[in-house]
A protein has these predicted regions:
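Terminal, membrane-proximal amphipathic helices
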Residues: 1-118, 145-245
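Transmembrane alpha-helix interface/packing and boundary motifs in multi-pass membrane proteins
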Residues: 119-131, 225
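Hydrophobic alpha-helical membrane segments of integral membrane proteins
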Residues: 132-137, 229
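Structural signature of FAD isoalloxazine-binding scaffolds in flavoprotein oxidoreductases
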Residues: 139-143
């Protein structure tokens, strides 16, 4: 007979179940019918162009853009909130106290999803698909940064940046690649391993994943007015990545 789980064990079990649900849903690759219908209209060079745009945007943000992103939230306050939540969880030892970390992260995530939706639809209305990419990544990384701070983690080192990039790639993966990437991330967290891949190479892989996944939606977003539909994809994919994070 199993003994009664303590609050930490119960919360961990809930986290594991949420991860398993995500993996089950994301494992099979799905292609919408409308994507197949517009395939012949999508320029052959668009995926290469998207990859280059994502790659340059990641480089720019990691090298010079993080301080700009941090101006949109109070890092010190979030770090202080984590310390308060950690102390409360240690003293009270209840699931409600433990869930304070998730509530803090969830509030930031929901706000960023709303910003992403407005930004994506607005750019789509004017048919601006490619110029939307730095904004899309900026909001996405802001959301991940805030989640990290809510749980007491940082994002300043290249190793942490590689982790974030790998997380984004994994959230967009399917099948064996999803399982492999997820295992690598879990090992990194549990055993404090280091990644053998360079940051530039991981940027390339993550840019490949984003370009492949968003190819059709960015094509649609590049069409005036109709692009509003493609613009909604910014929020959809940010939610998918945030859910995995």
């Amino acid at each position: 007979m199993k003994g009664k789980q303590n609050p930490v064990e119960k919360e961990w079990a809930a986290v594991v179940k949420a991860e398993e649900r995500f993996l089950r849903h994301a494992m099979p690759a799905r292609t919408a019918g409308w994507q197949e219908k517009i395939t012949r209209y999508v320029p052959q060079k668009l995926e290469t162009t998207l990859h280059a745009a994502f790659y340059k945007a990641f480089e720019l943000i990691f090298d010079r853009g993080t301080p700009v992103i941090e101006k949109t939230y109070q890092r010190e306050k979030k770090e202080q909130n984590y310390k308060i939540n950690a102390y409360t969880a240690e003293v009270r030892d209840t699931r409600h106290a433990l869930r304070a970390f998730g509530r803090e992260a969830g509030a930031s995530r929901n706000l960023n999803l709303a910003v992403s939706a407005v930004e994506g639809v607005g750019m789509g209305f004017f048919g601006l698909g490619l110029p939307d990419i730095p904004l899309f990544l900026g909001v996405l990384l802001k959301s991940i940064y805030e989640v990290a701070l809510s749980y007491g983690y940082t994002y300043d080192t290249q190793e942490e940046q590689i982790f974030i990039l790998k997380l984004i790639e994994t959230a967009l993966s399917h099948g064996e690649q999803l399982a492999q990437n997820n295992m690598e991330l879990n090992l990194w967290m549990r055993e404090e391993r280091t990644f053998s891949i360079s940051r530039n190479e991981q940027i390339r892989r993550t840019s490949d994943a984003l370009a492949g996944e968003l190819l059709y939606l960015k094509f649609v977003q590049g069409l005036p007015v109709v692009g509003m539909v493609g613009g909604v994809s910014d929020m959809v994919y940010q939610k998918r990545i945030s859910d995995y994070a």
